[in-house]
UniProtKB/Swiss-Prot annotation:
Localization per record: Cytoplasm
MF-aspect GO terms: L-threonine 3-dehydrogenase activity; zinc ion binding
Keywords: Cytoplasm, Metal-binding, NAD, Oxidoreductase, Zinc
Residues that bind Zn(2+) 2: 93, 96, 99, 107
High-level lineage: Bacteria, Pseudomonadati, Pseudomonadota, Gammaproteobacteria, Enterobacterales
Binding residues annotated for Zn(2+) 1, in chain numbering: 38, 63-64
Binding residue positions for NAD(+): 175, 195, 200, 262-264, 286-287
Known pathway: Amino-acid degradation; L-threonine degradation via oxydo-reductase pathway; glycine from L-threonine: step 1/2
Site (Important for catalytic activity for the proton relay mechanism but does not participate directly in the coordination of zinc atom): 148
Top-level class of the enzyme under EC nomenclature: oxidoreductase
Name of the molecule in the record: L-threonine 3-dehydrogenase
Reported function: Catalyzes the NAD(+)-dependent oxidation of L-threonine to 2-amino-3-ketobutyrate.
Major place of residence: cytoplasm
Keyword presence, Oxidoreductase: yes
Amino acid sequence: MKALSKLKAEEGIWMTDVPQPELGHNDIMIKIRKTAICGTDVHIYNWDEWSQKTIPVPMVVGHEYVGEVVAIGQEVKGFNIGDRVSGEGHITCGHCRNCRGGRTHLCRNTVGVGVNRPGSFAEYLVIPAFNAFKIPDNISDELAAIFDPFGNAVHTALSFDLVGEDVLVSGAGPIGIMAAAVCKHVGARHVVIADVNEYRLDLARKMGVTRAVNVSKENLNDVMTELGMTEGFDVGLEMSGAPPAFRSLLNSMNHGGRIAMLGIPPSDMSIDWNQVIFKGLFIKGIYGREMFETWYKMAALIQSGLDLTPIITHRFPIDEFQQGFDAMRSGKSGKVVLSWD
């Protein structure tokens, strides 16, 4: 079958032919319709330090997708041929304390689709049926293809009560923008997103944020004054992984504020811990999606009117995958969707 693979330990992704994956007793086989390019895929393309330590070569990559069930393992129940599905990209062990306690997103033995085992940039993907999620009929293939990153946004945003709260989102990548949109949709008062990338700040404006702030040109304190905020932000969502951005977020938080951190710093990060201690801040780390509460909430949010379509800015047939990666690497894109139809 046709697949996009990391074939060499150097920059790039290559189209190749690989054997069709084998179906296990507890697996389903998915014929891929659409895939989306994740920032992780860009790291793998660039062959950065993390990728060199993590990704086996050769490897079929990709983990954002939607497709149709075409084969079902003999032990599988609850799925039928023809079901439209996406799937949780974190495959868990089922026997560690967190898995047995129902906290599977915290499994200490997680294996990543398209990271540690063959991924979805291929005509067919096999995953455990446990990981598959049926897509409701009124959700499009394009939106279903970005459920993985949307889930990161939903998990982060819904970590805390948002109704009537003032929220600062640090980092206007696609996940940060979607998180900001979720905050507005569920009833936050002011949702401010901060970045230095004007293209992505414009995308955030299209998604309905209260203010999109280019922090290279504007001061967050001035924005807070403009919005009539007499105290700091109640909720902070750190989506950038940039140490200066996190320090700025800490400076802007109200006493007793709550922070959810999804962005991954490139190395050890120093902060002024006095901000955390004397403000009584609560900081929660976010990894992936809650299985499968986040998935049900994603579907419900879209069905209740949350419009994510502006975040999908580029669409290419799979044979033009290089243009998709070029768009992602340029920093002037939202989500990029590749069609396998």
